[in-house]
Design a protein with these regions (language model features):
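Short alpha-helical transmembrane segments in multi-pass integral membrane proteins
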Residues: 1-44, 99-166, 197-204, 212-268, ...
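Interfacial/gating helices of multi-pass transporter permease domains
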Residues: 39, 62-81, 149-156, 217-218, ...
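Transmembrane helical elements of multi-pass membrane transporters/channels
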Residues: 39-58, 160, 227-231, 235, ...
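Helix-terminus/linker motif at the lipid-water interface of multi-pass membrane proteins
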Residues: 45, 49-71, 141-148, 204-215, ...
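Residue-level hotspots within pore-lining transmembrane alpha-helices
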Residues: 46, 50, 54, 83, ...
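Alpha-helical transmembrane segments of multipass membrane proteins
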Residues: 56-60, 82, 131, 139, ...
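Small-residue-rich hydrophobic transmembrane alpha-helices
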Residues: 70-131, 168-182, 186-187, 298-362, ...
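Short runs within selected transmembrane alpha-helices of multi-pass transporters and secretion channels
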Residues: 92, 96, 160-180, 187-195, ...
Length: 474
């Protein structure tokens, strides 16, 4: 049964009466695992296409402004992705996990209260992101190697994109509340609408049109913030209207630490995990920027593909999270473990296949952004060395969602912290001590992916029934 109907009066899908909770929950608890995983993941393919479009088109348009604009935006891009991912697959997944476990346990009133607390957290986290970037942006981007026109472009992009972080947080938190009910289609549709709007208006804002002046790099940022603000407002209306399986209500609600904690116990490790992922790119971008602008651009364009691997994993991962979380909450532990194995294998296979293709044919990806031979040389070397290890990256990402569904995200954050250390320390040693140059630098990234997958596999395998944390997280 569909949870939404089309309308011509709003750019987003208009909600209809929801399907009974029992039908979707029964499918998650009793349906064939692989076909149910594919059924729940299918709408999230739209998420992949949306994020892929955003990542690709932003780089394409900014590249037309020149190398300084592209390099400046590349300094900011990991921070924008930090906000997007930490509120979607990080902190937002804490919302989804808590809601899924409440529904699995038959506690609908608790699920509704969790949505209210997620709303408060979205506003608070958005304000924190904006404040930190507005105050510390200039110093941060100088430390990352930004200077002159490159620094100006970075600041123009960052002040708008991260100043409007609350819009991103609200859309992702409320969307994850809906995903926690097992409804993947509606959040995917809203996100696609936002990204299509972003792609449509960004070139107009970047280059100008008619009476609209060109805004340069800041135009791409406005093209992100405005659609996400509209999408976030729509989700608030939808959840408040009572048309979803959970409801956002303010009447009679008061903040309760116990409910914040239920979200944060998964969300904070998820946020830290996402922070480690993006900090790795930030630091490696900074190291590469000090080796030269062309090296920085080449590395950034190669590493940008990893930002497509993550929403690809998210497409399957949100379904894995909902299925594992609901079955774990219903005390169907053996089924939850079987879902984990099948889900992780699927994500690793898909990511690994893409990695092999771009490792053999790097121009398929790099040609979208630049025709500079130096950029091709650096980016091609990166993909030759690192892309085959996307299988390990996919395995780690799949296990990350499993750990969140189990309500235990600390192990994933710890494993990603180790990966960050391997990337950064290994990269510095390779470049400045062993004098291995770019080859050693990129090899440290590949080794980091392998270590990440191995540690998470070990940690998740040690989760005990009924819901005892992995020993490493205790």
């Amino acid at each position: 049964m569909s949870d939404q109907t089309a309308t011509t009066s709003t750019p987003f899908p208009a909600p209809a009466k929801p399907a009974p909770a029992a039908a979707r929950t029964k499918l998650i608890l009793e349906g064939p695992i692989f076909s149910t995983l594919l059924r729940l993941s299918a709408p999230n393919v739209l998420n992949l296409l949306a994020f892929a479009g955003m990542v690709t088109f932003d780089g394409f348009f900014l590249g037309r402004l020149g190398s300084d604009a592209l390099a400046g935006a590349s300094l900011v891009f990991p921070w924008v992705m930090l906000v997007l991912q930490s509120t979607n697959s990080g902190m937002g997944a804490g919302v989804s996990s808590a809601v899924a476990r409440a529904i699995g346990a038959g506690k609908s009133e608790r699920a509704n209260a969790l949505v209210f607390h997620a709303f408060l957290l979205a506003l608070a986290l958005g304000a924190i992101f904006a404040g930190l970037m507005l105050l510390g942006g200039p110093t941060l981007f100088r430390l990352m190697g930004g200077q002159d026109d490159m620094l100006d472009a970075a600041l123009a992009y960052a002040y708008v994109a991260l100043g409007g972080a609350a819009a991103i947080c609200l859309l992702n938190f409320m969307g994850n509340a809906v995903r926690g009910t097992g409804n993947m289609a509606l959040p995917a549709g809203v996100l696609v609408a936002c990204v299509l709007a972003h792609i449509a208006i960004s070139p107009i804002l970047i280059f100008g049109f008619g009476p609209l002046p060109p805004l340069g790099a800041a135009g791409a940022a406005w093209g992100l913030v405005l659609p996400f603000a509209v999408g976030g407002a729509w989700f608030v209306w939808y959840l408040h209207s009572g048309r979803a399986l959970v409801r956002l209500t303010f009447r009679g609600m008061a903040p309760r630490w116990e409910l914040f904690a239920d979200i944060l116990k998964v969300g904070v490790p998820g946020l830290v995990n996402t922070a480690f992922t993006n900090l790795s790119v930030v630091v490696l971008t900074g190291i590469s920027a000090r080796m030269g602008r062309d090296i920085a651009i080449g590395y950034a364009m190669g590493a940008r593909l990893e930002y497509i691997m993550q929403p690809l994993a998210f497409g399957f991962g949100t379904a894995i999270l909902a299925m594992v979380g609901t079955n774990w909450g219903a005390r169907q532990y053996a089924r939850a473990r079987a879902i984990a194995v099948i889900g992780v294998t699927t994500v690793a296979t898909v990511c690994g296949s893409i990695g092999i293709i771009v490792a053999i044919f790097p121009a398929l990806w790099l040609g979208l952004f630049s025709d500079d031979p130096d950029v091709f040389r650096v980016g091609g070397l990166y993909l030759h060395i690192v892309a085959p290890f996307y299988l390990c990256f996919g395995m780690g990402l799949g296990l990350f969602f499993v750990s969140q569904g189990l309500g235990r995200g600390t192990a994933a954050a710890a494993a990603n912290g180790v990966r960050l250390g391997v990337n950064v320390v290994g990269g510095l040693i390779a470049v400045y001590w062993l004098d291995l140059g770019m080859t050693g630098f990129f090899a440290s990234v590949a080794v980091g992916f392998a270590v990440y997958a191995a540690l998470l596999a070990w940690a998740v395998a040690r989760v005990k029934e009924p819901g005892i944390a992995v020993a490493a997280t205790a």
